[in-house]
Amino acid sequence: MAEARTSLSAHCRGPLATGLHPDLDLPGRSLATPAPSCYLLGSEPSSGLGLQPETHLPEGSLKRCCVLGLPPTSPASSSPCASSDVTSIIRSSQTSLVTCVNGLRSPPLTGDLGGPSKRARPGPASTDSHEGSLQLEACRKASFLKQEPADEFSELFGPHQQGLPPPYPLSQLPPGPSLGGLGLGLAGRVVAGRQACRWVDCCAAYEQQEELVRHIEKSHIDQRKGEDFTCFWAGCVRRYKPFNARYKLLIHMRVHSGEKPNKCMFEGCSKAFSRLENLKIHLRSHTGEKPYLCQHPGCQKAFSNSSDRAKHQRTHLDTKPYACQIPGCSKRYTDPSSLRKHVKAHSAKEQQVRKKLHAGPDTEADVLTECLVLQQLHTSTQLAASDGKGGCGLGQELLPGVYPGSITPHNGLASGLLPPAHDVPSRHHPLDATTSSHHHLSPLPMAESTRDGLGPGLLSPIVSPLKGLGPPPLPPSSQSHSPGGQPFPTLPSKPSYPPFQSPPPPPLPSPQGYQGSFHSIQSCFPYGDCYRMAEPAAGGDGLVGETHGFNPLRPNGYHSLSTPLPATGYEALAEASCPTALPQQPSEDVVSSGPEDCGFFPNGAFDHCLGHIPSIYTDT
């Protein structure tokens, strides 16, 4: 009896139940003490109705078994109230619960007379039958555990239950709708490394893959009758579309079982295939055979399989069925691999755009900061140009070589345009630097500067020093040399004087107007008698009062301090007359030639400065 119980339990034990109701706690454990008895639900037409002990029924006529387990503490003579605890009964065994649900939900069977057989009802014949009735009652109360809707299998098996008999024996009768859903959810799971069959009404499991393949062929394919070669594997993509031959169904079942009998024979290659055609294609990769030639005229390309050839031939026919689905893109390709590469390129571009958008606010903030800094510099320059009354602040910043006493500009704008202060005296008279160090300027009239398009603060410090600097005294030698090396004629009307050695006065603060500019310039030249005596002798057109001071009516030299200039810009130099008759020296850097080459400014004296002033105007 123990052997019969063991064989029936191993043959009929179903898979574990999952997804049960949360109110029923089913721990994954079983009782250490085996169930006291095993009762079977009779399903054969020849068997009698009701429950019968397993000793009275032959083993070959049994179809299903229900292993019922009771708690070891429940005595056989317990009262119905004490043994009616549903929770304790359900916790006793998971397998008994699943088999009870399957037995309760199985469709009625056809008896000998064609009528449906009644369900097995326990009778009070013995104590064991009373315990079985309690278990069946508990299974009925737990019938809500798997209330799944009807799936696709219900449509398939519905007509067989109502009218036509199934094409396989009664021992493989398909379950009802709920059982189909339960089998779909539980079948096919590999428990403890076993290969499970996922046929819709089968719960067999095997240790080896070869056993599963043999089971599918013998139990499910060979038992089919007629021309219906349909795959009833749970979750098959064919959705019960039948094959027209048995061998095709056998080959198709290799997809579900994982069988790959076609193995590569080359050494070092362990690939295997379920279809022989795929193995042949693979062997061509070892042999280099390419039997599929391109059928386009003039094309000699060959391929190992027909699918690659078909992709290639689309390039000749200009047929590109694989189109990009991204909005705004009209690219089309002949094969899906090229389309996948194209889609990856799209994703890469999107990532770059996202990075740019992420870094965009930072870049805009940097640009805004730079613009604000430049705007502040521009504003400060304008304020410096209009700060002083005479407007000499900007001139000192732009021309540090002309103004040796000026402060070095902060932004380095004019540092590369003009030479430093110590370079200017080397090219001019030794007293030029001393004279220019005081930088007393004569402002231009507002009308002149406005007519030229420049502000009084910008034009006056640049043009005025060129026409307002005093003449240097003659050296003590009999002849003075020009920068070109040619001697100047001496003046015989006055003896020579010692060189000027008076120290230069300290630099004056920012000018507060031009009052007293005439006396400041006179203090720079204590030997003005030389100039006053030389002027009438050389010029010959002197006026009254020239020998006693500067004539305000004479448009020359310092006369521009109190008299408006007759012309704007550098044209005023052309209208000035030379007090001394000096030979003109040719120079390429001289801005204007003619009578303006006087003794005060020999040729080339301010050529370096004049050459860079127009560039300053254009830059501003």
Curated annotation (Swiss-Prot):
Biological processes, Gene Ontology terms: cell differentiation; negative regulation of transcription by RNA polymerase II; positive regulation of transcription by RNA polymerase II; regulation of transcription by RNA polymerase II
Motif Bipartite nuclear localization signal in this chain: 340-356
Region (Disordered): 108-132, 414-515
One GO CC term on file: nucleus
SMART domains recorded: ZnF_C2H2
Record InterPro entries: GLI-like, Znf-C2H2_ZIC1-5/GLI1-3-like, Znf_C2H2_sf, Znf_C2H2_type
Biotechnology: The combined transgenic expression of the OSK transcription factors POU5F1/OCT4, SOX2 and KLF4, reprograms differentiated cells into induced pluripotent stem cells/iSPCs. iPSCs exhibit the morphology and properties of embryonic stem/ES cells. The coexpression of GLIS1 can increase the efficiency of OSK-induced pluripotent stem cells/iPSCs production.
Biased composition (Low complexity): 477-488
Signal peptide: none
Start and end residues, zinc fingers (C2H2-type): 195-220, 229-256, 262-286, 292-316, 322-346
Family the entry assigns: Belongs to the GLI C2H2-type zinc-finger protein family.
Record function comment: Acts both as a repressor and an activator of transcription. Binds to the consensus sequence 5'-GACCACCCAC-3'. By controlling the expression of genes involved in cell differentiation inhibits the lineage commitment of multipotent cells. Prevents, for instance, the differentiation of multipotent mesenchymal cells into adipocyte and osteoblast.
Name by which UniProt lists this protein: Zinc finger protein GLIS1
Gene giving rise to this polypeptide: GLIS1
